[in-house]
UniProtKB/Swiss-Prot annotation:
The active site is at 89 (proton acceptor), 262 (nucleophile). Pathway: tRNA modification; tRNA-queuosine biosynthesis. NCBIfam families: Q_tRNA_tgt, tgt_general. Its EC number is 2.4.2.29. This is Queuine tRNA-ribosyltransferase. It comes from Pseudomonas aeruginosa (strain ATCC 15692 / DSM 22644 / CIP 104116 / JCM 14847 / LMG 12228 / 1C / PRS 101 / PAO1). GO terms for molecular function: metal ion binding; tRNA-guanosine(34) queuine transglycosylase activity. The keyword RNA-binding does not apply.
């Protein structure tokens, strides 16, 4: 992987990631393909909406169908017929999400499989081996996602464990040609975040992610971390904010120097009839749309907006037709890609402030302040 920083506007960065499988323009949003599929989307649909990289889930693919099945096809790209780059998360967040079903020790995590209840163990070495088998273009270290809230002592122990696991992940990654990203932890504590960052830089990674956000903390806390952390991260490596978020969150992350994002929100909300447009969110199942023959978003160039009315989308949603979820997903993911394309162009042109002001004005919101 090669990362080029092409332009800056304030803290915001316009860059380019180059892989053997393709180029990713940054800032970038990565659709989430948990089980080797972006729900409701054919691979050609993902290309059509402008996504250049997607995310796969190490934990779930390891448990089902398993790496042996996937490797019979070659790797995850071949299995799901996606030609572009794939980032795989390490499984750490999913293990964290199991709560009482898992036991964390120095060696790794033992847990009951959510598939069949069997006792399963995963540590840094296992995570790296699975991601290598998947043929990931970007591999994430195995870490512990610090819970929220966590006092200083709890967050410190968690962060230090993640650093030890980061070293083991780097060793286990070995001579793999895939990029390896570290993950900054430390909860909401600035000193721990900076110690985590220093430790990861000593180990050496191809890129760095910000983990442990969007885990239940108030948005103000997330913004506070994003105000102080990205400026401390190396300028010559990509910065990835994990699991975030709404379009507004992407804009605020980019304003603070983040390059990469992923989130299930656009796909999950699409299946629930919540559709993102420039003015905010349209709840397509509401009865007000039953007789509305207008397009969902006249500014959008997606297949859904080019061909179907709000009334038709409302009808599909009320009937529970799978086509409704598919068309909604196409639109939501295209909306996210359009936001990212607008951010990239604005940074390139040095007009980010105007873009952000217009973005919020369309939503009837004031532009949030930005620390210098």
């Amino acid at each position: 992987m090669n990362f080029e920083l092409l332009a800056t506007d304030g803290k915001a960065r316009r860059g380019r990631l180059t892989f053997p499988r393709g180029v990713v323009e940054t800032p970038a949003f990565m659709p989430v393909g948990t089980y080797g599929t972006v729900k409701g989307m054919l691979p050609r649909d993902i290309e059509d909406i402008g996504a250049q990289i997607i995310l796969g889930n190490t934990f779930h693919l390891w448990l089902r169908p398993g790496t042996e099945v996937i490797q019979r096809h070659g790797d995850l790209h071949d299995f799901m017929q996606w030609k572009g780059p794939i980032l795989t998360d390490s499984g750490g967040f999913q293990v964290f999400s199991l709560g009482a079903m898992r036991k964390i020790k120095e060696e790794g995590v033992t847990f009951a499989s959510p598939v069949d209840g069997a006792k399963v163990f995963m540590g840094p070495e296992e995570s790296m081996a699975v991601q290598r088998a998947l043929g990931s273009d970007i591999v994430m270290i195995f870490d512990e996602c610090t819970p929220y809230p966590a006092d200083h002592d709890v967050a410190k122990r968690s962060m230090e464990l993640s650093l030890r696991w980061a070293k083991r992940s780097k060793i286990a990654h070995g001579d793999s040609p895939s990029a390896l990203f570290g993950i900054v932890q430390g909860g909401m504590h600035e000193d721990l975040r900076l110690r985590s960052l220093d430790g990861l830089q000593e180990i050496g990674f191809d890129g760095l992610a910000i983990g442990g956000l969007s885990v239940g903390e108030p948005k103000e806390e997330m913004i506070r971390v994003l105000d102080f952390l990205p400026p401390q991260m190396p300028a010559d490596k990509p910065r990835y904010l994990m699991g975030v978020g709404k379009p507004e969150d992407l804009v605020e992350g980019v304003r603070r120097g983040v390059d990469m994002f992923d989130c299930v929100m656009p796909t999950r909300n699409a299946r629930n009839g919540h559709l993102f447009v420039d003015s905010g969110v349209i709840k397509i199942r509401n009865s007000v749309h039953k007789h509305d023959d207008s397009t969902l978003d006249p500014t959008c160039d997606c297949y859904t907006c080019k061909h179907f009315s709000r009334a038709y989308l409302h009808h599909l949603d009320k009937c529970g037709e799978m086509l409704g979820s598919m068309l909604n997903t196409i639109h939501n993911l295209r909306h996210y890609q359009r936001v990212m394309a607008g951010l990239r162009e604005a940074i390139q042109q040095g007009t980010l402030a105007a873009f952000v002001d217009a973005f919020y004005a369309k939503r009837g919101l004031p532009t949030p302040p930005l620390d210098a």
